[in-house]
Structure formats: C-alpha cells, structure tokens
Amino acid sequence: MDPDHQLASLARDIEVERVRGGVKAAEDRRAICRTRSRIDRGRDPRELVIAQGSPAIVGHSHNIDSTRLDFDLTSEQQSIRKLAKDFADKEIAPGARERDRNETFPKEVLRKMAPLGLLGGPVPEKYGGIGIDYVSHALVTEEVGRADSSVRTTLSVQISLVEMTILKFGTEEQKQRWLPRLCKGEVIGCFGLTEPEVGSDATKIRTSAKRDGDSWVLRGRKTWISNGSVSGLALVFAQADPSKEDKGITAFVLERDRQPYGSQALHGKLGLRSSDSSELILEDVRVPDANRLGEVGQGFKIAMSALDSGRYSVAAGAVGVAQACIDASVTYATTRKTFGKPIAGHQLVTELIADMVVETEAARLLVWRAGDLKDKGRPNTRETSIAKLYASEAAQRAADNAIQIHGGYGFSDEFPVERYWRDARVNRLYEGTTQIQKLIIGRFATGIDAIG
C-alpha cells in the first residue's frame, strides 16, 4: 500500500476510534499512569514527517541525531488528550463567559479536575501525581487553554511553576510534605518573583530575607502573582545577600496558615479575568530554614528553571487559544451567509482561516518538539523559548483574524473570540516577554548575551 493510502486508512481508523468514544474515565486514568515518556513510532497524517534520507536539521549546538522526525502520539497520549478534551468541553467551556464577566475564580472546575489527576499530571505517582510525560502534559494544557485561558493559567502556575519546581529542587521531605496536597487540589500554589519595580530583570528583586537563627525573616512586596489571593502556599524569592546580586537570591516555600503572608487581589485586567492576580505582602514573615528550597543563593537558578517550565505550559496553552479561534471561525464562516453563499466561500475569508491553521499547526509542533526534548532529558531552553515566542504570537494573530471573520459579532462577548483576543495578549508578556524570548534565542544563535 502506498504512503497516501496508508495515511488515509489510518485517518479513518482514528476517526472511528474517536466516534466510539475511546475509553472510560477510569481506564483513561490508568492509561495516563502507564504513559511516562514512551514515544511510539506510528503514523499520524496530521503531524510532520521528514522522510528518511533527507538532510538533518542543524541548529547552533543543537544537531538533531536522526534524519527522521516523527511526532506521532501513542495510544495512551491519545487517551489523555481525549480525557482532557471531554472534560474541557463539558466542565470548563460552558461557564467561561460568565466567569469572565464576573471575574469568578474557577474553584469548582479545579475541584472536579483533581480526581482525574489533572492537577498533578507530570508529577510522579509517589508524590500524588500521575506521572505523564511532557508531551502529554502539553496535550492537557492545550485542551484546557482551548476552553478557557483563565483556567489554564491557574493550572500552569500550580503545576509548571510550583509543583515541578518543588519536584526538581526540593528535598525528599519537602516533596512528601507539599506535592501530594498540591496534586490533590487541597492547596493552591503561587509563584512570587515579580515585584512592583522589578519584572524582566529578576536579578534586582528587593524583597529581603534576613537570617535569624533557624529561621529567615522575609520583607517585601510581589505583584502580578497568579493565584496569589487564593493560594495556601507560595514559592517566594528573596534577596539574602545584596552584595552577591543574583548569587544572593534564595527561594522559600511559605504556607499561609503557618507563615501568614498577605495578599490583595488586582482587578481591571484586560484578559484572564477569572484567574486570580494579586499582590503578595510580606511584612516580617518568619520562615523556618526547613522551608528554604535549594541552597542559599540558588534562588535565581531555581527561578529561571521554573520560568523555562512555565514557558512550555504557556506555549501549549497558546496553541489551545489558536485552535479555539479556528474552531469558532470555521463554525461561523460555514454558517454565516453573504451574497448568497457562506462567507467561507469568499477567498479572503478562507485566506484568514488558512493562515490560522498553518500557524497553529506549526506552533503545536514546536511545542511537541520542546516536550520531546524534555522527556529525553536533553537541553531544551532554546526550543522552549522558540515555542513560547511563536505560539503566543500566533495565538494573537489567530484571535485577531477570528474577530475579523466574525465582523461586528466578534466585538461582542456574545461570541467567544473577543475573549480569546483579550486572553491571548498576556501570553506575550508573562513567563518572559516576546522580547526576552528573542534575546534568549539570539544568544543561542550568536553565542553573545545581549541581555546584560
């Protein structure tokens, strides 16, 4: 059978499996737990294949060690995607508009996500997670982002910034102490790095940490902290030795019921209105040294590692927004009629949709490439920044095109595309702005650090 017929046959098989409904939720959960980092090598007509024998792609210090790239999903990964999609369609998307209008934090959605393991996906089972691989994590994040970026933001902070950072840098006692509660949704976590006067240049944070016996006393303010006012646990960065600059920054985990920190919710945001954004207020908060994450002076390294993880999640969520724009635009363009035919029959409208599809597919593959490297334990900062940059920009363009296709209706929240546009905008800001991503990518290309 020639390749085209093989692909067509596989496409039919996948569609039949989709219509059958896949596996039940309990079977999905068992499938998730089995996934780990396995990557089968089947064929999927939607994904990129570089034929065997074609030249390898070469980048600065990132030679690809294979002449064949294959981004197929395993059956387990397909089950994970279906589980996340079904949950997003049933439990997240229906209430997104009202949550956005009322700035309502999605605590009920999170409560329903926890039993499915979606609050601790890539965390190993022994710490309360379900141990899925990074590509699977991207699939879940994309589907959640497709339904509601506010929920996706909450999830990204909980998993990528807080859980995965504790997993990577915490002691065994710290992992056992905090991760199960986070994965079960018993406590919401936040990540306290940004300050009123300090954003991209995190080496200049002013929050102080002064040693006092077996404790530290933290003083300062953080701002634009997602999950801040709803959090029961905060991963906070403070300067323990200003003379050492970034080498003095140290990380601490604060439990609000034991190390009471203050918070003040921020309102009037352009987008992500149902996610929580807050100031954190640290007024001589006493923190045991046992709550220090990593070594003294290791905080900046920990923060950069966490942001790298967060960028991956933001990129996957941005793909979800772009896909939502495509879905809404196709539905509208094939039903709305002008001049006696659906507007999809007008070439300039079709061009807008085609542009959206191309950029979304490209962004998705960039995310999967970064995830594949993460699963293999290989360096991926460059690839993650590329994915974050491209996906966030593509999502904004897709949302803009979607509004154009919807015309006047796109300017009203009776249709979701205006929310997609507002929510997409922040992807170009947090976890490193578009400009910061370009500086990182440029450093890998030239070997020269233009940041400072």
Segments predicted by a language model, with ranges:
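Hydrophobic alpha-helical signal/anchor motif
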Residues: 1, 14-19, 23, 32, ...
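Intrinsic-disorder-associated, low-complexity terminal segments enriched in Asp/Asn/His/Tyr and depleted
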Residues: 2-5, 13, 28, 40, ...
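Alpha-helical interface subdomain recognition
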Residues: 34, 51-157, 169-174, 181-186, ...
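Short Gly/Pro-enriched turn/cap motifs at secondary-structure boundaries
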Residues: 155, 182, 197-200, 224-227, ...
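A short, Trp-centered hydrophobic/proline-enriched beta-strand micro-motif
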Residues: 185-193
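Flexible, small-/acidic-enriched active-site or ligand-binding loops
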Residues: 204, 257-286
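A short core secondary-structure module
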Residues: 215, 219-263
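Long, acidic (Asp/Glu-rich), low-complexity accessory segments flanking structured domains
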Residues: 284-302
